[in-house]
Amino acid sequence: MVWGLDMVGPLRKGPGVFTHLLIAVDKFTMWIEAKPITNIRSEEAVKLFLDIIYRFGVPNCIITDHGTNFTRKKFLDFSDGYSIRID
């Protein structure tokens, strides 16, 4: 199972002061998961992928654009802990 992960934003502030969208796409089924977020820290990506793991299972690989929020220690430790390759 391979997922793509990207961040969209900044957006105009709406209800709840959300400024970005975190988007994950299953590359086989093209299923989309989107989560509005208020900050772009790597913790938000970890939370989204924990939810994905609980519902769909552990992916083999996550494809990112290597943005700083996806290359920080917290996200890399999370992916190492689940043996997820980051491309």
Where are these regions (language model features)?
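Retroviral integrase
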Residues: 1-87
